[in-house]
Swiss-Prot record:
It comes from the Archaea. It is an enzyme of class 3 (hydrolase). This is Protein pelota homolog. It comes from Haloquadratum walsbyi (strain DSM 16790 / HBSQ001). It is found in: Cytoplasm.
């Protein structure tokens, strides 16, 4: 996510210019935008001309700049777009004011959002921005006598390591283990969440075995992918196959799963946990919450007043953050979030047990 500008809007609201850069960013926006927010951007709309001096286009689409008051939001995953519908309150054609319109927001579209951001919503957008700037995945490509390491961020790839050496027999050759040692040492120094180890043939498997024996601290980060080439071409193959996106998703799910496992263990042993809105709200009032966990779609429903919780969820979140606790919003699309939903959609890891 890019945030080109931030400013103040009317009635104490904030006005942010946002540019989603991938499907994940569109998904984040679907959990931030709410009814009553204002969203502006470029669009097309079918216009029926009624002016007798102008030729009727039969409803030809025209380019417009509009701002709508949000009524509904739909994340169309398979279309890779976010549909934001509502009444047009500002438009480059005044005769379109008051009509209902749907903005189809896709990757790299710029939109202007005016709303009162809740702390977790602001955190979500800023985390998406940070993800675009920081590399969290390395693509390591290797074949006989050649090895490369690239970091992958949403703005592109950057080569961090490159070695070419003659391995095998001969006066100027070096043992394969020397190349593997340099390669593994470089990977160990990298601050990334996951490493995709790719390349043709079996050299990558041999490198994996070397890492298992000599650099075991990074072995759990490795995912093996077959490619026909190494270097820039190999990285392109990895990206084209969607392997990086898949690894990033699995990394996020893994982090969420660790929290849920800790929660379930606490339930089993009677440790310091709370679950269900009533228990969590009580713990938040006492300042006992260390980490609050909530399912994203449940949070969205409660904010739209279409949920069934009797307590205002934003009050609970504010109490937690004011007392120095953290808030983790889990995706309801994956197993950790689904397990949390079965516990009422909200739970907390506590600093101390409530009597």
């Amino acid at each position: 996510m890019r945030i080109p500008s931030r400013g103040r809007g009317e009635e104490g609201k904030e006005q942010w210019t946002l540019v989603p850069e991938n499907v994940d960013d569109l998904w984040h926006l679907s959990h931030v935008l709410e009814p009553g927010d204002r969203v502006g951007g470029d669009t097309t709309r079918r216009i029926q001309r009624n002016d007798e001096n102008l030729r009727d286009t039969g409803g030809q689409r025209e380019h417009l700049v509009v701002t709508i008051e949000v009524a509904d939001v739909e994340f169309a995953r398979f279309a890779n777009r976010l549909r934001v519908g509502g009444e047009i309150i500002s438009c480059s054609r005044e005769d379109e004011l008051g009509h209902y319109h749907t903005l189809n927001v896709e990757s790299h579209d710029e939109i202007i959002v005016t709303k009162k951001f809740a702390p977790d919503q602001r955190k979500r957008i800023e985390a998406a921005e940070e993800a675009a700037e920081n590399a969290d995945v390395a693509v390591a490509t290797i074949e006989e006598g050649e090895a490369h390491i690239h970091t992958v961020a949403q703005y592109g790839t950057e080569e961090q390591f490159s070695r070419t050496a003659t391995t095998g027999k001969g006066e100027y050759s070096q043992p394969r283990t020397e190349l593997f040692a340099e390669f593994a040492a470089a990977l160990s120094r990298m601050d990334v969440d996951a490493i995709i180890l790719a390349g043709p043939g079996f050299t990558k498997q041999d490198a994996e075995e070397y890492i298992q024996s000599n650099n075991p601290e990074i072995i759990d980060k490795l995912t093996i992918v077959d490619t026909a080439a190494v270097g820039d071409r190999g990285v392109h193959e990895v990206l084209k196959r969607g392997a990086v996106d898949e690894v990033q998703t699995q990394t996020r799910i893994s982090a969420e799963a660790e929290l849920i496992d800790e929660l379930m263990e606490g339930i089993a042993t009677g440790e310091k946990i709370a679950y269900g809105i009533d228990e969590v709200a009580k713990a938040a009032e006492f300042g006992a919450v260390d980490d609050l966990l909530v399912v994203d779609d449940q949070l969205r429903e409660e904010r739209r007043d279409s949920g069934d919780w009797s307590t205002d969820v934003d009050t609970v979140l504010q109490n937690v953050e004011q007392q120095g606790g953290s808030v983790t919003v889990l995706s309801g699309e994956f197993d950790p979030g689904q397990r949390l939903r079965n516990l009422g959609g909200i739970a907390a890891l506590l600093r101390y047990r409530l009597q």
